[in-house]
């Protein structure tokens, strides 16, 4: 525990007494001005072996007491102060750094870990996944499915005009039967007439006319 005993020098006693002796300031204004100028001159700032003291300035009662630089206030061991203390330098450096970052819009880089995902790559992967899902998705709308099958079959057919209508229906029906279904709740309903029913109807009508 630091020694709480504090030695009071003669200068400290003189400064303390001058706080209560205001008669020297009541003579005239020139005397007060002269005292203030002399007390603020560098020659009136005394330094001891292990402390720095300041004599009475005469400016105010609070500034009249001699200030002694110690480690932990008035009580404690006297220490030498060579420049700004280390903790004050650290505080100033941190404040200056924050102000610099604020003015220049720069922030200290955060370390990247293996668990973190780059936002740009995340968006790219999501877009890729959506495109893949759209590619293999089978529509549940029968009209849309029939339209797709119809356009696919027409594009696969040659441009030969001799292709019959029954061949086109057979091709569409075979494609519709082989199309995969995502959900069993949506069975494929065949709204188009079958080839056999068309042929039978045609044959029946021809027999009636004959």
UniProtKB/Swiss-Prot annotation:
Signal peptide feature range: none
Phosphoserine PTM sites in chain numbering: 18, 39, 41, 57, 60, 178, 189, 192
Keywords (A to Z) from UniProt: Phosphoprotein
Composition-biased stretches (Polar residues): 33-46, 102-116, 191-210
Basic and acidic residues: compositionally biased ranges: 130-139
Extra remark: Present with 1890 molecules/cell in log phase SD medium.
Chain spans, region Disordered: 33-58, 100-139, 177-210
This protein's record includes keyword Phosphoprotein: yes
Name the UniProt record assigns to this protein: Uncharacterized protein YER079W
Gene Ontology CC annotation, any one: nucleus
Organism of derivation: Saccharomyces cerevisiae (strain ATCC 204508 / S288c)
């Amino acid at each position: 525990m630091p020694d709480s005993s504090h030695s009071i020098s003669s200068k400290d006693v003189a400064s303390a007494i001058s706080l209560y002796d205001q008669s020297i300031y009541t003579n005239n204004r020139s005397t007060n001005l002269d005292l203030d100028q002399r007390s603020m001159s560098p020659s009136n700032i005394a330094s001891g072996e292990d402390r720095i003291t300041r004599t009475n300035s005469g400016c105010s009662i609070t500034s009249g007491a001699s200030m002694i630089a110690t480690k932990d206030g008035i009580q404690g061991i006297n220490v030498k102060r060579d420049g700004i203390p280390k903790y004050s330098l650290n505080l100033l450096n941190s404040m200056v750094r924050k102000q610099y970052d604020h003015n220049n819009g720069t922030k200290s880089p955060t370390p990247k870990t293996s668990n973190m995902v780059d936002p740009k790559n995340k968006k790219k992967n999501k877009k890729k996944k959506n495109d893949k899902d759209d590619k293999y998705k089978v529509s549940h709308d029968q009209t849309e499915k029939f339209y797709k099958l119809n356009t696919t079959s027409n594009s696969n057919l040659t441009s030969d005009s001799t292709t019959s209508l029954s061949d086109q229906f057979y091709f569409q029906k075979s494609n519709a039967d082989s199309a995969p279904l995502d959900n069993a709740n949506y069975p494929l309903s065949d709204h188009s007439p079958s080839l056999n029913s068309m042929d039978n109807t045609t044959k029946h009508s021809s027999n009636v006319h004959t």
